[in-house]
Amino acid sequence: MRGYLITFEGPDGAGKTTVINEIIKQLPQSLQERTLVTREPGGSKISENIRTIILDPENKEMDDRTEALLYAAQRSQHVSEVIRPALATGKVVLSDRFIDSSLAYQGVGRNLGIEEVKQINDFGTGGLEPDLTIFLDLDPAVGLARIEKERAGQEDRLEQEKIDFHNKVYAGYRELFERYPDRIKKVDANLPIKDVAANSVKIIRKQLPDIFM
């Protein structure tokens, strides 16, 4: 039984974590038992430590290239320590963010270039790509308003960026959606969470039917 990597992407406040938790509830019990949920930045002890550095609001002087390299570093560790071993045992891995986040946030948002950022990430992950990516499509302003309502004053370093940055990131996601239409599928994240999750499960069933066998 082969493993599958399904990633969830979208702007800050799109509800990725909540949607993934709801998706788990909607999966058959047998599939729930072979599913591993993880996140980025993070997912392993070392990667979580790097996450703290990346997102700490105190690190305002962080250079854009440093940021991109730290994301690639935590991803390299995450893949080698968590994702590849899980895939090797036939797990279905659901990851809250993966390489597309770097391509959108650092490649486009930080103007470092999609291809340049992809190159350092491919080096770190050995070229591992998701079998399917769910893009939770939401206007960045709506997402940031959600964050402010839920945890005002506790935003991380990237969430604190100006709206112009978040709009560029969103444009980056749209570009990736158009560039990789076979892998990246869009879901309207304005809908209620249960509907967003149900629509995501429909896409998974259609794109990766073998998972449910």
Swiss-Prot record:
ATP binds at residues 10-17. Keywords: ATP-binding, Kinase, Nucleotide biosynthesis, Nucleotide-binding, Transferase. GO terms for biological process: dTDP biosynthetic process; dTTP biosynthetic process; dUDP biosynthetic process. It is an enzyme of class 2 (transferase). Its EC number is 2.7.4.9. GO terms for molecular function: ATP binding; dTMP kinase activity. Gene3D superfamilies: P-loop containing nucleotide triphosphate hydrolases. PROSITE patterns: THYMIDYLATE_KINASE (PS01331). It catalyses: dTMP + ATP = dTDP + ADP. Pfam families: Thymidylate_kin. GO terms for cellular component: cytosol. HAMAP family: Thymidylate_kinase. This is Thymidylate kinase. It comes from Lactobacillus johnsonii (strain CNCM I-12250 / La1 / NCC 533). The gene is tmk.
